[in-house]
Regions:
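Phosphate/anion-contacting hairpin/loop surfaces
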Residues: 65, 69-167, 172-179, 187
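Basic, nucleic-acid-binding surfaces and adjacent catalytic neighborhoods in DNA/RNA-processing proteins
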Residues: 22-40, 54, 70, 145-265
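Generic detection of long, well-ordered alpha-helical segments
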Residues: 1-4, 134, 138, 192-200
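A cross-family signal for N-terminal binding/gating loops and helix N-caps
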Residues: 1-113, 238-247, 260-265
Length: 265
């Protein structure tokens, strides 16, 4: 499943190709995604100039003067820049055809992604109550510590909650907890402010490295040009069961937290 670094990588990849370009056609081959593509999507977007491409959590916002297309990649979705007349393949669900001869094509074998529309996207019900971005200044140890008070869940479950902070999925939660030396099974309310500050620092480091590396190659994720991300070989703990811990001589163990697997030394 594409996580924040993968979505950020996609945003950075497509932006130079579609920024300030006009959408001259939208080709919808199959509108049956997680939610059906709205019938008026073509009316909303055709002949509109793309003024920016933004990311909020794991959503991409294709902004025009009168509103934004909200794209979620779901579990297996990807966006590619192609020549406008490139024949579609299986699972290619829609194209945004632009006035520079290229198209932005969405592919999604599992169809858990979505394409929605909002006049003010940050007020949309899917985005309005989300937590802060992990790489922004407002995400601090003090903030995280205050949110954790009286929470009776593990620290790993806590930081994976998008209403606490967005974009810290299973892989990056595992890596951040490993880097900060915090037991993933520890109750969130029992983590001190000092250790929360260390955890926030680790989250920022891990996510920045993943973005710089182009995302994590896990099953379905590809960059905007179809090439695979290449961060997986840089992970310290995730998916490293029984392999030596880089910080000690002990083997990395697999445990289950909240129905998700977690690897730890």
């Amino acid at each position: 499943m594409p996580e924040l670094p993968e979505v950020e990588t996609t945003k950075r990849g497509i932006h130079p190709w579609i920024h300030q370009k006009k959408i001259i056609e939208i080709i919808i081959r199959d509108k049956r995604l997680r939610w059906p593509i709205p019938d008026d999507m073509r009316e909303k977007l055709i002949n509109r100039e793309i003024i920016s491409v933004q990311r909020r959590a794991k959503y991409l916002l294709i902004e025009t003067a009168n509103g934004s297309a909200i794209i979620h990649l779901g579990m297996s979705g990807s966006l590619r820049i192609i020549e406008h007349d490139e024949p579609p393949r299986k699972h290619d669900h829609y194209d945004f055809v632009l006035n520079n001869g290229i198209a932005l094509r969405y592919r999604d074998p599992r169809r858990f992604g979505s394409l929605l529309w909002a006049k003010e996207p940050l007020k949309h019900k899917l985005l309005s109550k989300l937590g802060p971005e992990p790489l922004e200044e407002e995400f601090t140890g003090t903030y995280l510590h205050s949110k954790a008070k009286s929470r009776k869940i593990t620290i790993k479950q806590f930081i994976m909650n998008a209403y606490v902070v967005v974009g810290v999925g299973n892989i990056y939660a595992s890596e951040s907890l490993f880097l900060s030396g915090i037991n993933p099974k520890r109750m969130a309310s029992r983590v001190s402010k000092k250790r929360m500050t260390a955890l926030v620092k680790a989250i920022k480091i891990i996510l920045k490295k993943a973005i710089d590396a182009g995302g994590t190659t896990l099953r379905d994720f590809h960059n905007r040009d179809g090439s695979e991300g290449y961060c997986k070989n840089k992970l310290n703990a995730f998916d490293k069961k029984n392999k030596p811990c880089p910080n000690s001589n002990s083997a990395i163990r697999l445990i289950v937290i909240g129905q998700r697997s977690h690897t730890t030394a």
